């Protein structure tokens, strides 16, 4: 009798699936279209009113208010920066409980960049604000965090509307200071996994101009790199520019160090292991005819594996110190190397979570619009949510932003003064993908 009933149930389910389930219940994508108009206006507001890392109070206040209106239990502000960062953290945590089941954390970041927008959009940013040095700078959303915040809210609204389709808990995170690598750790330091439910999964999206609007990219395993910011002070002995023999020139020494650093990856790292060392800034001297006492270098170092990361940093220190010694720099004037400026750990997308999610996304968006992509040497502190003792599986998908048919070689990239997403298509796809992902993880 049990076999018979099971057979009937299976037949009934097959019949429903074959003859009208989707007709009775609109797809997530169709439902997302209904929210796109209101979300578009919100996106334009966020884009036109960007705020730098540590100063996201207006963005987070708006997000908190909108999440509260959607029925979430909102706590704001949340976050605790380290003692040396003397700023209030404006993080947002919003919870929607809907019976028994898993907990899914959905994160979006909110901060912008100190850049002058040149897109010419009618809603382009003309914002200016003081940065952490006190200097007033132009501010722009050049990394898509305005889109991340908009999509986060759209998915939150959708999940509230679709409570009859899922069971469990949704934790929405509005995160600060991603561009400085400290926002995720600030939330965790303030008890994110103690004061609120520990997630069984954590998911996020990041805009990607290498993909067209309407497309989603995914990368199982290592997806984004360790990011180390290193400051080096090359110290010499200052003198008159007409009498260089009376000093030790830190400008020439810096040039030698920079050239030598080009061998760190090519001669110290296994060729099949990714690694990047870039000198992004060099500053020294005040006048044509003065050999300065010191020159300052700023480096960024990228890797995936911890063993490679350590070898890169050790090689930088060895080359820098010994190049100075070879130039006759005395022991008390050897270079000062600060490797703890900023660090963001590599992001590892849980392969099982990725595989599970990708099938759902292909069903919702079409197989041709869900594309496996290569790992990136960019960095993202979303990785921090999976690095605690709870070992939460995480997945950050990539959200296409480029106009259909545009040339990938000439599209403005992230952190470009010309970058902007195609708004409607990006919003709809982002909300669809995130909502479908969470529904799949919490499906009744």
What are these regions (language model features)?
Residues 19-23:
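Sec/Tat signal peptide C-region and signal peptidase I cleavage site
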Residues 24-141, 150-167:
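Acidic/His- and Gly-rich active-site-bordering loop/insert found
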Residues 46, 94, 106, 145, ...:
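Divalent metal-coordination and catalytic microenvironments
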Residues 255-444:
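Metal-dependent amide/peptide-bond hydrolase catalytic core
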């Amino acid at each position: 009798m049990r076999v018979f009933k099971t057979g009937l149930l299976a037949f009934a389910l097959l019949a429903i699936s074959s003859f009208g389930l989707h007709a009775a219940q609109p797809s997530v994508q169709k439902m997302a279209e209904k929210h796109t108009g209101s979300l578009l206006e919100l996106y334009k507001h966020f884009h036109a009113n960007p705020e730098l890392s540590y100063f996201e109070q207006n963005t987070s206040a708006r997000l908190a208010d909108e999440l509260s209106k959607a029925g979430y239990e909102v706590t704001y502000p949340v976050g605790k920066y380290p003692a040396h960062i003397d700023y209030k953290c404006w993080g947002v945590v919003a919870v929607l409980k809907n019976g028994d089941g898993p907990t899914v954390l959905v994160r979006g970041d909110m901060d912008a960049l100190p850049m002058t927008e040149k897109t010419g959009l009618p809603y382009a940013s003309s914002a200016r604000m003081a940065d952490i040095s006190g200097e007033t700078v132009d501010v722009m959303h050049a990394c898509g965090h305005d889109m991340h915040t908009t999509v986060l809210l759209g998915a939150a609204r959708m999940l509230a509307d679709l409570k009859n389709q899922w069971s469990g808990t949704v934790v929405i995170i509005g995160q600060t200071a991603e561009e400085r690598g400290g926002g995720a750790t600030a939330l965790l330091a303030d008890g994110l996994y103690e004061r609120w439910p520990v997630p069984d999964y954590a998911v996020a999206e990041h805009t990607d101009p290498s993909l067209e609007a309407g497309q989603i990219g995914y990368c199982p395993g290592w997806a984004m790199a360790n990011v180390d910011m290193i400051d080096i002070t090359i110290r010499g002995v200052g003198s008159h520019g007409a009498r260089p023999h009376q000093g030790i020139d830190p400008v020439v020494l810096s040039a030698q160090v920079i050239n030598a650093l080009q061998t760190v990856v090519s001669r110290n790292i296994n060729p099949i292991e990714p690694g990047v060392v870039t000198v992004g800034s060099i500053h020294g001297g005040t006048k044509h005819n003065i050999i300065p006492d010191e020159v300052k270098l700023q480096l960024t170092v990228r890797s995936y594996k911890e063993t490679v990361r350590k070898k890169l940093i050790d090689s930088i220190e060895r080359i820098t110190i010994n190049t100075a010694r070879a130039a006759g720099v005395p022991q008390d004037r050897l270079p000062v190397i600060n490797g703890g400026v900023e660090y963001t750990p590599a992001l590892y997308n849980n392969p099982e979570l990725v595989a599970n999610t990708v099938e759902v996304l292909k069903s919702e968006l079409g197989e041709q619009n869900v594309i496996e992509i290569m790992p990136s040497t960019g960095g993202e502190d979303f990785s921090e949510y999976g690095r605690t003792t709870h070992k939460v599986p995480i997945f950050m998908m990539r959200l296409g932003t480029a106009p259909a048919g545009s040339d990938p070689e000439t599209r403005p990239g992230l952190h470009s003064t010309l970058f902007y997403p195609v708004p409607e298509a990006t919003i709809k796809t982002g909300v669809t993908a995130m909502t479908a992902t969470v529904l799949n993880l919490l499906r009744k």
